[in-house]
Amino acid sequence: MKTLLLTLVVVTIVCLDLGYTRECYLNPHDTQTCPSGQEICYVKSWCNAWCSSRGKVLEFGCAATCPSVNTGTEIKCCSADKCNTYP
């Protein structure tokens, strides 16, 4: 009976995946495991002086809430693993 109870506890912990954290892109190719409490993935994009030749500047990351942006900055926030891709 104790073995059965222990087995049920282990299965429950594995199924619940306690301590799960979000995984977001850090750049267009690499991901990072977000710190506890940061469940939002985001990608910011904006133009700087070299936008016409290099394209937009991109910033990827994790956050507890969707970051605020300035005029001229685009942001995409999402709450699934690896959802902060950029086309």
Curated annotation (Swiss-Prot):
What keywords tag this UniProt record?
A: Acetylcholine receptor inhibiting toxin, Disulfide bond, Ion channel impairing toxin, Neurotoxin, Postsynaptic neurotoxin, Secreted, Signal, Toxin
Q: Is Disulfide bond given among the entry's keywords? A: yes
Q: Cystine bridges: which residues?
A: C24-C41, C34-C62, C47-C51, C66-C77, C78-C83
Q: What PROSITE patterns does UniProt report for this protein, alphabetically?
A: SNAKE_TOXIN
Name the InterPro entries for this protein: Snake_3FTx, Snake_toxin-like_sf, Snake_toxin_con_site, Toxin_cobra-type
Q: Does the keyword Ubl conjugation apply?
A: no
State the GO CC annotations.
extracellular region
Location relative to the cell: Secreted
Q: Note the SUPFAM superfamilies from the entry.
A: Snake toxin-like
Tissues/organs with expression: Expressed by the venom gland.
Question: Which superkingdom, per the lineage?
Answer: Eukaryota
Which terms in the Gene Ontology molecular function aspect does this entry carry?
acetylcholine receptor inhibitor activity; ion channel regulator activity; toxin activity
**What family is this?**
Belongs to the three-finger toxin family. Long-chain subfamily. Type II alpha-neurotoxin sub-subfamily.
Its biological purpose: Binds with high affinity to muscular (tested on Torpedo marmorata, Kd=1.6 nM) and neuronal (chimeric alpha-7/CHRNA7, Kd=3 nM) nicotinic acetylcholine receptor (nAChR) and inhibits acetylcholine from binding to the receptor, thereby impairing neuromuscular and neuronal transmission. Also shows a very weak inhibition on GABA(A) receptors.
Its protein name is Alpha-elapitoxin-Ls2a
Organism name: Laticauda semifasciata (Black-banded sea krait)
